[in-house]
């Protein structure tokens, strides 16, 4: 068996492509050695303050509303342990494996920035867990996104102190067993170490990144399904003329129009009907660059925010070794992540909404010119009639889920923490939304492939024909009504892949 490739993490410079790879697993993570000096210096600063018994929040005080309570030096280890245990109050299903891998990696990166005052050994332990795929069991619910992701990160920290639970090879084991599996003894946490592990936006950021990556996949699938529909109804490519989009100047719109032109290059279908009498296609066809371009702009902006956050020191307080100061602030507040997740949600909803409208167009014989509901013997057969109902149901569900979460706030900790971001929920819903959108887009692509089969006298472009063949490799032509649920699931998986032609990959932030 060959050794896993090593991915070296450079704190402050981890890329989206690296984060996507971390989520997928299959590589060994290592920390850039240059980070060691900064971590040691910040740890020394914290140790000095603890010995001098200066009163500094997070080192020798209580937390939240109890921040004014001074803790004796001989109880600092107890303070940190109690912090971790008392905050392990999450509920709900465990986070997906890929999300937990990103949580481990981004927490290690954050601590390695040298502003948290923890031992390098703690960072090494986080990476050891990730490398062995020993994944802390982190309940998905229980964080309001300020002060950081306290409850879910406490469940991660529990494993480091031999408490809580982890997943090893599909089995659930105790935290102590998990540490033994990577050859480590549970930690006795030093001053500030428990707080540094709990404070931070790593869970909401990892969830938002998972949502971003899933959204990129269905965005690409949505462009392919749109091209398939265009070809099936013999629509016009004139609305994708570069001059139209350059006249407006929106970057995403220009990129999407270029991607569609590249996908359709070499098609024999469009040149075959220059004088068909159709003046303008419906908006769901004609305005693909405008709608999907706006979605791409949202995804690109969210990607920039999340890459910054994945590299951020989001602990509190922060240690500044050049002056020896430990300063309280609010980098744990996940408002940037909440906003990013909200605009990913808007994009996911719209990708599904316009796809569902194209699906409805395909099934309407008066608009598409194709057999009603894409079945030859309609009446006896219902064809894709109720598959469109499923798509409509999921599009409506996504429209409800897309309501901004960041506008919701409830005070906590006796009103000390009086404004929160709700970033964790904002990000957590994205995977559900992406799954819904993948089903919608998958149904459209399956229906469009069906529509193309009613006239195969001419071929589409090489890239679209390749996608047509990929679809036919998953689902057969619908000659008469059959059990469609397995076909819909097969097409959901098609729409969820990350293997897309170069013109699409060139649009997507995490593919760069």
Swiss-Prot record:
It comes from the Bacteria. It holds the Pfam family Lyase_aromatic. PROSITE patterns: PAL_HISTIDASE. Pathway: Amino-acid degradation; L-histidine degradation into L-glutamate; N-formimidoyl-L-glutamate from L-histidine: step 1/3. It catalyses: L-histidine = trans-urocanate + NH4(+). The keyword Lipid metabolism does not apply. One of its GO terms (molecular function) is histidine ammonia-lyase activity. Keywords: Cytoplasm, Histidine metabolism, Lyase. Contains an active site 4-methylidene-imidazol-5-one (MIO), which is formed autocatalytically by cyclization and dehydration of residues Ala-Ser-Gly. The keyword Transferase does not apply. Its EC number is 4.3.1.3. NCBIfam families: hutH, PRK09367.1. This is Histidine ammonia-lyase. It comes from Paracidovorax citrulli (strain AAC00-1) (Acidovorax citrulli).
């Amino acid at each position: 068996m060959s050794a896993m490739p090593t991915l070296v993490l450079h704190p402050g410079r981890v890329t989206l492509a690296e984060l996507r790879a971390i989520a997928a697993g299959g590589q060994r993570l290592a920390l850039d050695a240059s980070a060691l000096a900064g971590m040691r210096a910040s740890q020394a600063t914290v140790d000095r303050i603890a010995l001098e018994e200066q009163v500094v929040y997070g080192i020798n005080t209580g937390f939240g509303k109890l921040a004014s309570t001074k803790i004796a030096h001989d109880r600092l280890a107890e303070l940190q342990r109690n912090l971790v245990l008392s905050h392990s109050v999450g509920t709900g299903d465990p986070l997906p494996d890929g999300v937990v891998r990103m949580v481990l990696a981004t927490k290690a990166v954050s601590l390695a920035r040298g502003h948290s005052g923890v031992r390098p050994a703690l960072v090494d332990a986080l990476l050891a867990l990730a490398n062995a795929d020993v994944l802390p069991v982190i309940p998905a619910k229980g964080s309001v996104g300020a002060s950081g992701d306290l409850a879910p990160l406490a469940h991660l920290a529990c494993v480091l102190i031999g408490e809580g639970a982890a997943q090893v090879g599909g089995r659930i084991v105790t935290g102590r067993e998990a540490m033994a599996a990577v050859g480590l003894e549970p930690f006795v946490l030093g001053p500030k170490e428990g707080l540094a592990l709990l404070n931070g936006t790593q869970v909401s950021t990892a969830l938002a990144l998972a949502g971003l990556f899933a959204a990129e996949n269905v965005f690409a699938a949505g462009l392919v399904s749109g091209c398939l529909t265009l070809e099936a109804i013999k629509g016009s490519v004139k609305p994708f003329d570069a001059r139209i989009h350059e006249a407006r100047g929106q970057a995403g719109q220009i990129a999407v129009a270029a991607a569609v032109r590249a996908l359709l290059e070499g098609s024999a279908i469009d040149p075959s009907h220059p004088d068909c009498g159709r003046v303008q296609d419906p908006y769901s066809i004609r305005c693909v660059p405008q709608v999907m371009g706006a979605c791409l702009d949202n995804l690109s902006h969210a990607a920039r925010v999340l890459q910054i956050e994945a590299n951020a020191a989001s602990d509190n307080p922060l240690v500044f070794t050049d002056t020896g100061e430990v300063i309280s602030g609010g980098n744990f507040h996940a408002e940037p992540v909440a906003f990013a997740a909200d605009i990913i949600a808007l994009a996911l909803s719209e990708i599904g909404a316009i796809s569902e409208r194209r699906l409805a167009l395909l099934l309407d014989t008066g608009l598409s010119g194709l057999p009603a509901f894409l079945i030859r013997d309609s009446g006896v057969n219902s064809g894709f009639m109720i598959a469109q109902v499923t798509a409509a149901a999921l599009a409506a569900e996504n429209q409800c889920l897309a309501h901004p979460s960041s506008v919701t706030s409830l005070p906590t900790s006796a009103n000390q923490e009086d404004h929160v971001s709700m970033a964790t929920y904002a990000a957590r819903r994205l995977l559900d939304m992406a799954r819904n959108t993948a089903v919608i887009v998958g149904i459209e692509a399956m229906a469009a492939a069906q529509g193309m089969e009613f006239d195969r006298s001419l071929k589409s472009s090489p890239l679209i024909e390749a996608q047509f063949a990929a679809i036919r490799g998953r689902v057969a032509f619908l000659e008469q009504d059959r059990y469609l649920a397995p076909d819909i699931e097969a097409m959901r998986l098609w729409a969820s892949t990350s293997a897309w032609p170069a013109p699409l990959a060139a649009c997507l932030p995490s593919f760069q």
